């Protein structure tokens, strides 16, 4: 593993109704990036917020001498789609993702950069001493366990988005066009060298989490069905096992009929109905699972954009640091963009 040269660091932050936390987020993230001793940019993506988040992002990007890029989506597309939109607008040799709720401190950014510079393709993180409630922790643990078992990707904390990706991994993820995307798993699928570090975790100071317990369970189902075919294989095993059990049960009923006569077979009518209902339930479950996969395939085949960028706001060229100008930033104001 060779050291990885990092001249420009991009920090991509998806934002959804985080008006209260944005001033502190910008202040702390800029301070952490300045301590790197490298050129940096902060790409903030507004994911269709209903509060004043988009206005605050645009105002931050229009400041003279700042390295903030505001990406405004026309509506809410979800956290991972917003991150991909930020990836498209980033130019860094290393791209770091960070949540806007400040539960993962921006002060951890230098540690991720340090490990990435050692040559790791992906640097993940594990939340140390989580400050979430039990209603958040237990569903999260179930998600981690289910995804680890079904995808085979060895990660300890899928819910922590404080991660670092080298540029080649980001480009590989952008080349994938599937609609349902979970960035940590997708990135690890392309990475050769990965590592994880423990990071601090704080209580949420403003607002509420966007992931409820039910939404976490829905996320687990989405992950399992969009990233692996393991459920289909398990369904095949279950179907084969139930078919064998049904065949053996039929032989058992035949033996009982021959031994005790037709009267006993009549008494076993309800057992047959119970078995029939059980098999019917498994069949319907299998049809629903197949329908889920077919629906995802249909969405991917249509190849519709995963998001639509309404506008991108970045500082004027004269105000940008020279390292950022060399990286290709030439736009001078708010500009419309397409995915």
Curated annotation (Swiss-Prot):
Pathway: Glycolipid biosynthesis; 4-amino-4-deoxy-alpha-L-arabinose undecaprenyl phosphate biosynthesis; 4-amino-4-deoxy-alpha-L-arabinose undecaprenyl phosphate from UDP-4-deoxy-4-formamido-beta-L-arabinose and undecaprenyl phosphate: step 1/2; Bacterial outer membrane biogenesis; lipopolysaccharide biosynthesis
Entries under Pfam families matching the protein: Glycos_transf_2 (PF00535)
GO molecular function: phosphotransferase activity, for other substituted phosphate groups; undecaprenyl-phosphate 4-deoxy-4-formamido-L-arabinose transferase activity
Transmembrane region(s): 235-255, 269-289
Gene3D superfamilies, per the entry: Spore Coat Polysaccharide Biosynthesis Protein SpsA, Chain A
InterPro entries named in the record: ArnC_tfrase, Glyco_trans_2-like, Glycosyltransferase_2, Nucleotide-diphossugar_trans
GO biological process, one term: 4-amino-4-deoxy-alpha-L-arabinopyranosyl undecaprenyl phosphate biosynthetic process
Entry EC no(s): 2.4.2.53
Keyword set includes rRNA-binding: no
Membrane topology: Multi-pass membrane protein
Localization per Swiss-Prot or TrEMBL: Cell inner membrane
KW Lipid metabolism (keyword) present: yes
Keywords, alphabetical: Antibiotic resistance, Cell inner membrane, Cell membrane, Glycosyltransferase, Lipid A biosynthesis, Lipid biosynthesis, Lipid metabolism, Lipopolysaccharide biosynthesis, Membrane, Transferase, Transmembrane, Transmembrane helix
Catalytic activity: UDP-4-deoxy-4-formamido-beta-L-arabinose + di-trans,octa-cis-undecaprenyl phosphate = 4-deoxy-4-formamido-alpha-L-arabinopyranosyl di-trans,octa-cis-undecaprenyl phosphate + UDP
CDD domains membership: DPM1_like_bac
GO CC annotation terms, alphabetical: plasma membrane
NCBIfam families, A to Z: PRK10714.1
Family assignment from sequence similarity: Belongs to the glycosyltransferase 2 family.
Functional summary from the UniProt entry: Catalyzes the transfer of 4-deoxy-4-formamido-L-arabinose from UDP to undecaprenyl phosphate. The modified arabinose is attached to lipid A and is required for resistance to polymyxin and cationic antimicrobial peptides.
The protein's name: Undecaprenyl-phosphate 4-deoxy-4-formamido-L-arabinose transferase
Name of the coding gene: arnC
């Amino acid at each position: 593993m060779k050291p990885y040269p990092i001249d420009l660091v991009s920090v991509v932050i998806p934002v959804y109704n985080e008006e209260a936390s944005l001033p502190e987020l910008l202040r702390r993230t800029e301070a952490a990036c300045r301590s790197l001793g490298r050129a940096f940019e902060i790409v903030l993506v507004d994911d269709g917020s209903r509060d004043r988040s988009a206005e605050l992002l645009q105002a931050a990007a229009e400041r003279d001498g700042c390295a903030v890029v505001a990406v405004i989506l026309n509506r809410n597309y979800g956290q991972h789609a917003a991150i991909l939109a930020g990836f498209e607008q980033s130019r860094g040799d290393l791209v770091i993702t960070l949540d806007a709720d400040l539960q993962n401190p921006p002060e951890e950014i230098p540690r991720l950069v340090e490990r990435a510079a050692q040559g790791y393709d992906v640097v993940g993180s594990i939340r140390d001493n989580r400050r979430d409630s039990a209603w958040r922790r237990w569903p999260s643990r179930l998600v981690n366990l289910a995804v680890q078992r079904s995808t085979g990707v060895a990660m300890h904390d899928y819910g922590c988005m404080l991660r670092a990706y080298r540029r080649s991994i980001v480009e590989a993820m952008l080349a994938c066009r599937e609609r349902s995307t979970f960035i940590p798993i997708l990135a690890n699928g392309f990475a050769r060298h990965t590592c994880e570090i423990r990071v601090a975790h704080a209580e949420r100071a403003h607002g509420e989490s966007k992931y409820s317990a039910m939404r976490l369970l829905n996320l687990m189902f989405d992950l399992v069905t969009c990233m692996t075919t393991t459920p289909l294989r398990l369904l095949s095993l279950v179907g084969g096992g139930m078919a064998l059990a049904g065949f053996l049960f039929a032989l058992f009923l035949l033996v009982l009929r021959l031994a005790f006569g037709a009267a006993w077979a009549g008494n076993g009518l309800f057992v047959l109905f119970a078995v029939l209902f059980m098999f019917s339930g498994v069949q319907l479950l299998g049809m629903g699972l197949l329908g889920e996969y077919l629906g995802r395939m249909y969405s991917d085949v249509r190849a519709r954009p995963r998001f639509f960028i309404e506008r991108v706001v970045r500082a004027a060229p004269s105000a940008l640091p020279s390292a950022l100008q060399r990286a290709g930033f030439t736009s001078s104001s708010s500009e419309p963009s397409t995915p």
